[in-house]
Design a protein with these regions (language model features):
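Charged helix-capping and loop-helix junction motifs
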Residues: 162-167
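Substrate-engagement module of ASCE P-loop NTPases
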Residues: 170
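ATP-hydrolysis module of ASCE/P-loop NTPase motor domains
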Residues: 148
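Short, conserved active-site loop motifs that form the nucleotide-linked donor/cofactor pocket
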Residues: 145
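Conserved small/polar residues in nucleotide/adenosyl-binding loops
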Residues: 173-175
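Flexible phosphate-sensing "switch/lid" loops adjacent to ATP/NTP-binding sites
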Residues: 151
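Short boundary/hinge segments that flank catalytic cores
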Residues: 1-94, 100-121, 125-129, 133, ...
Length: 175
């Protein structure tokens, strides 16, 4: 018995989950992991435009939060979230990407940010003294895109994300 989902057929066979897009395998870019550019039409740009169109069609008018998740590290959630965010920003949507993979942060790589960038873990570790909005970084890719990176890997990631302050303060940045 096979326990690994390897392709679209596996997803369709064992789930009722709708597939919004199927991304082709791509070479890693030299700098960062953003593979789409404004006004280009290669296969990745078109694939992310298709994902964006399907996502917007699927979401309700007032739905403004999209969660990207996976079962294991290295499956591409930061890559897909980052490129989808850029695609939405190029459409004129205001977007903030919030890095919550605080065990193995990757947004710094995706957006070519400093590995020392402060982020949500700084805030969650000391919410009384750290301003959440000071952790947000403006993207040089689009004026419509901001990033709240994960921050340094904490010794207690589970406890940090379980804090009530997280839910309350993420509602402040809800666009």
């Amino acid at each position: 018995m096979k326990y690994k989902i390897e392709n679209r057929d596996d997803v369709e066979r064992i789930t009722t989950v709708g597939i919004l897009a199927e991304l082709p395998k791509c070479d890693k870019p030299e700098k960062g992991a953003i593979v789409i550019r404004e006004n280009k039409n290669d296969i990745m740009e078109e694939t992310f435009r298709g994902l964006r169109t399907n996502l917007l069609f699927m979401l309700g008018k007032d739905d403004k939060v999209v969660l990207f998740s996976s079962t294991q590290p290295g499956e591409g959630k930061s890559f897909v979230a980052g490129n989808t965010a850029v695609s939405l920003a190029f459409l004129g949507k205001k977007v903030i990407v919030v890095g919550m993979d605080i065990r193995k942060p990757d947004l710094n790589k995706v957006f070519n940010l400093s590995r020392r960038a402060e982020g949500i873990t700084n805030y969650l570790s000391d919410p009384e003294n750290v301003n959440l909005f000071d952790m947000v970084q403006h993207s040089d890719i689009s004026p419509n895109l901001d990033i709240l990176p994960e921050g340094p890997v904490p010794p207690n990631p589970t406890e940090l994300v379980a804090r009530d302050v997280l839910v309350l303060d993420l509602s402040l940045i809800h666009i």
